[in-house]
């Protein structure tokens, strides 16, 4: 199975192997380049899920993404499912008990502290918003603005949402993970806070 070469490969190495260096990082294109089958047909039996990964009739991993979800949510969900593929399915393909089903609770951490889900979320963040690219984009934005003192956090967040084609919430979580904004930062409460 050609997909086995991706077992346990970190997101940054996948991007490097596929020569993807500039945002946005489209997980549908990444999946295609990796050789992963992705379905996003309307399936009422799966509609309560945002996405899932399972073995198809040929024993090959296949990912399903709910087409009823907003596009940016589909993007994060697919990146998350690719994380499951890389870390939980391919390394244990012979023992894989499918499917892994993901919904709002597992994807968006509503108190969930499942290590598999945390790892898949981390993979998704690294795939969609890699540190090397975030840093380059932010530095370029600061330069064009004449310095970070001329920008608010909202300015930077809004720009990143546009450049990386992910949700505002995904960008905020990622910036908090990277220590670029305080953990207690709230987008809607910002009152002209300049970048630090």
Predicted regions and their residues:
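Active-site hotspot residues in diverse enzymes, especially metal/ion-binding acidic/histidine motifs
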Residues: 1-196
């Amino acid at each position: 199975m050609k997909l086995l070469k991706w077992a346990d490969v970190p997101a940054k190495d996948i991007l490097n192997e596929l020569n993807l260096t500039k945002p946005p990082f489209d997980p549908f294109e990444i999946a295609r380049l990796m050789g992963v089958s992705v379905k996003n047909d309307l399936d009422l039996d799966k509609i309560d899920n945002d996405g899932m990964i399972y073995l198809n009739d040929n024993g090959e991993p296949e990912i399903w993404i709910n087409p009823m979800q907003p596009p940016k949510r589909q993007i994060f969900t697919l990146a998350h499912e690719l994380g499951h593929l890389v870390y939980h399915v391919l390394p244990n393909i012979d023992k894989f008990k499918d499917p892994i089903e993901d919904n709002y609770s597992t994807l968006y951490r509503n108190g969930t502290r499942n290590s598999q889900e945390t790892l898949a979320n981390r993979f998704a963040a690294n795939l969609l918003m890699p540190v090397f690219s975030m840093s380059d984009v932010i530095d370029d934005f600061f330069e064009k603005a004449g310095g970070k003192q001329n920008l608010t956090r909202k300015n930077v967040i809004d720009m990143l949402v546009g450049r990386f084609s992910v949700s505002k919430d995904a960008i905020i979580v990622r910036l908090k993970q990277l220590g670029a904004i305080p953990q207690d930062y709230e987008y809607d409460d910002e009152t002209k806070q300049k970048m630090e």
